[in-house]
Regions:
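Conserved, mostly hydrophobic/aromatic
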Residues: 27, 91, 132, 169
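Alpha-helix-loop-beta-strand connector modules within alpha/beta enzyme cores
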Residues: 45-65, 73-74, 81-82, 92, ...
Length: 187
């Protein structure tokens, strides 16, 4: 079953990916309904999520990057208790737990070579995420091939440096792109 937040992602072509708490105010001024939190620790992640919610946005937290969390299922439970609307992870175990809890799940993978791309397809099939995020994004042919072969929609992220990169990824079939480049958050 398709998670309701996938529609929000479809309507948010560029997702702000916040790498430090100091970047969050700028991300909340950008257009769109979703913010990716690629920062935080066990002491402040709840407050960061609350700030995103106060701006009427959805908070999707990169579980692997929250300082103090172990790569275990209980970490996903903790993030849900903190109010996260979804999780990002490179770990299929955490993706499966997020799905069990009803969170939006984003499986993040790195397309460093053809073997990694093949592995991504298998992991995505096994973990059944709502969305797959592939990095780096400026590879339109790879984005196109993955977007056509995956069951889950594809987010392109990493190394997005200009509007042309955004448009190329979207034209290649990506659902949306995620970027930490503030200049691109409102294109």
């Amino acid at each position: 079953m398709r998670h309701a937040l996938v529609t929000t992602l479809e309507n948010t072509p560029v997702i702000p990916a916040v790498k430090t708490p100091e970047e969050l105010p700028a991300a909340l001024r950008a257009e769109g309904g979703v913010v990716f939190l690629l920062c935080g620790d066990i002491l402040n992640i709840g407050e960061l999520i609350a700030q995103v919610h106060a701006a009427n946005r959805r908070a999707v937290v990169h579980a692997d990057l929250v300082a103090g969390l172990a790569p275990r299922e209980i970490a996903v439970d903790f993030l849900q208790c903190c109010g996260a609307d979804g999780i990002i992870s490179t770990r299929p175990l955490l993706i499966r737990r997020g799905r069990e809890l009803g969170l939006l799940t984003v499986l993040r993978a790195f397309g460093i070579d053809s073997k990694a791309i093949e592995s991504l397809a298998r992991e995505a099939e096994s973990a059944a995420p709502d969305v797959v995020e592939m990095l780096p994004a400026p590879m339109p042919r790879v984005v196109r091939r993955l977007a056509q072969s995956l069951r889950a929609p594809l987010i392109a992220g990493g190394l997005i440096t200009d509007k042309e990169d955004v448009l190329a990824a979207l034209s290649a079939g990506a659902l949306c792109v995620s970027t930490s480049d503030e200049a691109l958050w409102s294109i």
